[in-house]
Amino acid sequence: MSSSPSPRFVSRLTRNTLVLILAGGRGSRLMDLTTWRAKPAVPFGGKFRIIDFTLSNCINSGIRRIGVLTQYKAHSLIRHLRLGWGSLRGDFGEFVEILPAQQRTEGSWYRGTADAVYQSLDIVRMHDPDYVLILAGDHVYKMDYGPMLARHVETGADVTVGCLEVPVEEASAFGVMAVDGDNRVVRFQEKPADPPSIPGQSDRALASMGIYIFNRAFLFNQLIADARKESDHDFGKDIIPSLIDQARVIAFPFRDAATGGQAYWRDVGTIDAFWRTNLELVGVNPQLNLYDKEWPIWTHQEQLPPAKFVFDDDDRRGMAVDSMVSGGCIISGAYLRRSLLFSSVVVEDGSRVEDAVILPEAHIEPGCRIRKAVIDKHCRLAAGTVIGEDPEEDARRFHLSPGGVVLVTPDMLGQEIHNVYT
């Protein structure tokens, strides 16, 4: 964050809540994009990292006690947290604390989402919260967690599960639940092959967001019991299903506060979803509003000059249409259409970039043609490179997604990346 955010929505309830963000996953469906970074550290939206959305939701909700559990290739994530999220007031009991995997129990790394929290129980005890809010650090959405906390207390729940409606054909990727008239969860299946639909809505299913609120003592008891069992030590696979018949598990539907309809939430866990969700932002009125001053997305703000567009000749003109171009970029006699450029990208004379997501510090030399692609950080494309026009050639040289998006990384280009930050 460029400066410490002003207090908002802070109450006794939010003050007595500890957040644990699960940020240790690789996100293997993002292919080579997560070879050198954890999924929550993947750049998104022109200037952010994916985890910034979850962290910003916490800050904007008035929750200022946050632990981030890391494991897989965490250096770039830890560096980002240190640079961008170190301005909270420790003397006021506010913090973003990094909790790396340390083999605290029996010398093992995190065996699942529940085990990750179990291995940090001593830290949770030290902070002594009334409630523990468990979040995933790899989704893109805006959510005020305050109403969910209030609902958890009002209903006397042992655990509250955030949920949303999804198309039934996509529900197999989620934990799917059924609820009664009071939103009490009566059935929960993790990634079922044949997901049940919502009664009266045969094309929709109620899916878990991977957001859980536990009463502290109840959480401790469940995690200690699970650690003694042979299981996957996972909230969705083990903890939540085991509680349906013996505890009060309440669903909290995530809805748009203004309309009451379906709220914006994206899992950017595949190359196609990552590309599509980024390019949604270049629309005239995207559903995810990054310009909303009432719910800002905080991040580390590198000090960079404004983007620059140069040359206005008949044969070369630096211009961008239906695009977002971040600070530090130089568009030198090149044409951009419906693309999103992160910071410090250079596009040289005669190059044409369409339907592309270009990550920071990429350099596109003269005469390149790029279409429907994701270009990773630090890539340097040689003059005349063509991407996105010949699927067979793209598949041979790069990674071609099922949806036809071409992923290009420095390693695919034979470029050294071991000595740069990711």
UniProtKB/Swiss-Prot annotation:
Protein name (database record): Glucose-1-phosphate adenylyltransferase 2
Assembly, per entry: Homotetramer.
InterPro entries from the UniProt entry: ADP-Glc_PPase, ADP_Glu_pyroP_CS, GlgC_bac, GlmU/GlgC-like_hexapep, NTP_transferase_dom, Nucleotide-diphossugar_trans, Trimer_LpxA-like_sf
Pfam families: Hexapep_GlmU (PF24894), NTP_transferase (PF00483)
GO biological process: glycogen biosynthetic process
Organism: Alkalilimnicola ehrlichii (strain ATCC BAA-1101 / DSM 17681 / MLHE-1)
Family assignment from sequence similarity: Belongs to the bacterial/plant glucose-1-phosphate adenylyltransferase family.
UniProt entry keywords in alphabetical sequence: ATP-binding, Carbohydrate metabolism, Glycogen biosynthesis, Glycogen metabolism, Nucleotide-binding, Nucleotidyltransferase, Transferase
Residues noted as binding alpha-D-glucose 1-phosphate in the record, renumbered to the chain: 110, 175, 190-191, 208
Cytoplasm listed as a keyword: no
Reaction(s) this enzyme catalyzes, per UniProt: alpha-D-glucose 1-phosphate + ATP + H(+) = ADP-alpha-D-glucose + diphosphate
Listed pathway(s): Glycan biosynthesis; glycogen biosynthesis
A GO MF label: glucose-1-phosphate adenylyltransferase activity
EC number assigned by the record: 2.7.7.27
First-tier enzyme category under EC: transferase
